[in-house]
Amino acid sequence: MNPTARYVIEAVYPAAALLLPPAMNTPAAWRMLTAIGLQESRFRHRAQVLGPARGFWQFERGGGVVAVLRHEASRDAARDVLTRLCYADTSPQKIHAALEHNDVLAACFARLLLWTAARPLPTAPSAGGEPYLATWRPG
């Protein structure tokens, strides 16, 4: 296993789980986020190579960051996470920049973005592409 993926699974996810509502802390969610992180950055790049995305889950400021901050399903939990992590400036610009340097914040935002999909997470690995495509919109 990629040593950074091990770090994310063993250290980042447990810390993120403590900051998020209990309903978001499911094995299916963490598996899905692991697959997304491996797809987006291979857990090697916190800043997109030749691009604007930040964090292992490759958030863009005007896309995923704004979506998490504004979506009805995620905004209150996002504010709570930011408060608990002592981020006073919650502008999309500042949060976007912070995702590159705070893996727990990035994991929380990735879980919150996945939460906005408003569909249950698939139980079959072969169905995992749908929520990824719906929320990350890669390409």
Mark where each language-model region is.
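Surface-exposed patches in mature extracellular/periplasmic domains of secreted proteins
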Residues: 20-33, 46-48, 121-128
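Catalytic phosphate/metal-binding cores of nucleic-acid and nucleotide-processing enzymes, i.e., regions
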Residues: 3-12, 16-27, 35-38
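Peptidoglycan-targeting cell-wall enzymes and recognition modules
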Residues: 2-11, 38-118
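Structured segments of extracytoplasmic/periplasmic soluble domains
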Residues: 15, 19, 39, 113-117, ...
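Acidic helix/loop microenvironments that form the catalytic cleft of cell-wall polysaccharide enzymes
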Residues: 37-41, 121-139
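Amphipathic alpha-helical interaction segments
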Residues: 31-35, 108, 131
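Generic secondary-structure transition motif, activating predominantly at the C-termini of alpha-helices
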Residues: 17-20, 73-76, 86, 136-137
